[in-house]
UniProtKB/Swiss-Prot annotation:
Complex formation: Heterodimer of LeuC and LeuD.
Lineage of origin: Bacteria, Pseudomonadati, Pseudomonadota, Gammaproteobacteria, Aeromonadales
Enzyme Commission code: 4.2.1.33
Chemical reaction(s) catalysed: (2R,3S)-3-isopropylmalate = (2S)-2-isopropylmalate
Coiled-coil regions listed in the entry: none
Binding positions ([4Fe-4S] cluster): 347, 407, 410
Cofactor: [4Fe-4S] cluster
GO biological process: L-leucine biosynthetic process
Keyword annotations from UniProtKB, A to Z: 4Fe-4S, Amino-acid biosynthesis, Branched-chain amino acid biosynthesis, Iron, Iron-sulfur, Leucine biosynthesis, Lyase, Metal-binding
Record pathway: Amino-acid biosynthesis; L-leucine biosynthesis; L-leucine from 3-methyl-2-oxobutanoate: step 2/4
Cofactor note: Binds 1 [4Fe-4S] cluster per subunit.
Name of the featured protein: 3-isopropylmalate dehydratase large subunit
Keyword Coiled coil applies: no
Amino acid sequence: MAKTLYQKVFEAHVVYEAAGETPIIYIDRHLVHEVTSPQAFDGLREKGRKVRRTDRTWATMDHNVSTTSNDINASGEMARVQMQTLMKNTDDFGVPLYGLNHKWQGIVHVMGPEIGLTLPGTTIVCGDSHTATHGAFGALAFGIGTSEVEHVLATQTLKQSRAKTMKIEVTGKVGPGVTAKDIVLAIIGKTGTAGGTGYVVEFCGTAIQALTMEERMTVCNMAIELGAKAGMVAADQTTFDYLKGRPFAPKGADWDAAVEYWSTLKTDAGAKFDAELVLDGAAIEPQVTWGTNPGQVISINTPIPAPEDFADPVARSSAQKALEYMALTAGQKLSDVKIDKAFIGSCTNGRIEDIRAAAAVAKGRKVAPGVQALVVPGSQQVKAQAEAEGLDKILTEAGFEWRLPGCSMCLAMNNDRLEPGERCAATSNRNFEGRQGRGGRTHLVSPAMAAAAAITGHFVDVREL
């Protein structure tokens, strides 16, 4: 029987399935951070349990960390407690920790791939909703709750129902100035934020195959934003070239055997998907969200829609509330919308290619008066690479702030946040009310579009700069 990529990876990890029961699957990689792990480790202590596979578990600090100081106290008392608790827990249970001063510290979904923890055909979980990022490698990766974190720590397994399958094909070739972020925002604009609920999505098509690994990570990162359990891209030569030689990637004969196996992990001809969607890559333009969920998105040159444009009453009501919260009006041009802040970073767009894209726009230009623009590398490795290339100098000379790695302004869990009423061009993944700070207004864009907005002081088509 012909199988999809998802079905192949899932079935390879079923360790037990009783009749009428939810399957139990094996977990190959468990990534841990400071926010969703404390209660899980406490649960192990209370029951006298150990971490079953300390060699399959890795921890880092990212959500709470300060991006201006390596001082553990710099982000406030709650952050200090969570980070110190992670240090104690990883020490007590023998779990490797890439802490504030470690060369591999960074956002968990940036760190994992760049050191070779993320491999095709593996199952990967983390107590974080954007774990789908790792699906770019042909892995089955998804976020879990804290009780499930405890279960994986104790057993290295998880009860997991089979998901429905969805194929999203992006055909053709995208034009200049159109990025992976624009592709995935355009997809979510078509599906809405619930279109993928109950599905694992496989992204495919010539426009997807043409993406670099970092670009594929951006696409899979936001699979959760269309409601999907996970997003996947089949591994290919681009994947193998990215992984070869990374610290945790197989070596020598093991590498050859791994590539041979990984090459079988693709959807068979004739395999049936439960749902399919096709987008024309050439028709995608730079995207900007206008509302309070990622599905409320339009191309930069499209006027902001009116609530009455939506046939569905729920969508109509949501649009009305979004316009009020965002202080926008139907028919308004995005180019007329001024910003207060720009944020370039996050697990969606905090990698070296993202920093390069922002620097290319910033070079020889200046941040607009009254705009604060932050560039936050996704990891210590990204930071070091960017500095080796002189990108930090280009950005700071243009008036951008060059920060230390962390989740930063993606979410209001550290010192980087919006004040009420402030408007931000952000390369992160969520534009919910208050996501970047109480009363803050978030517009999701690509790194190049965020840099362009920072320089002009308002949203602008980066292709016209």
